[in-house]
Swiss-Prot record:
Organism: Exiguobacterium sibiricum (strain DSM 17290 / CCUG 55495 / CIP 109462 / JCM 13490 / 255-15)
Protein name: S-ribosylhomocysteine lyase
UniProt keyword rRNA processing present: no
Details of cofactor binding: Binds 1 Fe cation per subunit.
HAMAP family for this protein: LuxS
Keyword Transit peptide: no
Assembly and oligomerization: Homodimer.
Cofactor: Fe cation
Family: Belongs to the LuxS family.
Recorded catalytic activity of this chain's protein: S-(5-deoxy-D-ribos-5-yl)-L-homocysteine = (S)-4,5-dihydroxypentane-2,3-dione + L-homocysteine
Length: 154
């Protein structure tokens, strides 16, 4: 099968060859002074397991809120449409090792969470669609694979 080169970086990634969980640099965007680094934070194996939307939505809230307690370089935390992980955009932050440390600290915060940040109709577009227990399950599962986060292809 010949695969056409696409404009989107992740569409050029062979999802059959990656081994979740992992953290990798998915792209760079250089400005005049600064560099935006996009990270692929993969929780589940593509085309095998997807996180349920409610658990993923809760993880998004917890990750987006709590990771900023550890770094001012965070631009955005975005869920992947395939529901297997998140993209994190960082400013001038080009280190998978340091990113892994940030994610680890933040996932430990998820495990300790007793409430979901911004879970209300004023601050969230689907406030009733959350699952804290499910978010903790996937945080725990991701942390269990911590020693393998630097191994993208398996």
């Amino acid at each position: 099968m010949t695969i056409k080169k696409m404009n989107v970086e992740s569409f050029n990634l062979d999802h059959t060859k990656v081994k979740a969980p992992y953290i990798r640099v998915a792209g760079y965007k250089d400005g005049k002074v600064d560099q935006v680094v996009k990270y692929d934070i993969r929780f589940t194996q593509p085309n095998v397991e997807q996180m349920p939307m409610r658990a993923m939505h809760t993880l998004e809230h917890l990750l987006a809120e709590n990771i900023r307690n550890y770094s001012d370089d965070v631009i955005d935390v975005s869920p992947m449409g395939c529901q297997t992980g998140f993209y994190m955009a960082m400013m001038n932050f080009d280190s998978v090792e340091k990113m892994s440390e940030l994610v680890e600290k933040t996932l430990k915060d998820v495990l300790a969470a007793e409430e979901i940040p911004a879970q209300n109709e004023v601050q969230c577009g689907f406030a009733s669609a959350h699952d804290l227990k499910g978010a903790k399950h996937y945080a725990e599962k991701m942390l269990a694979g911590r020693d393998e986060w630097d191994i993208v292809f398996g």
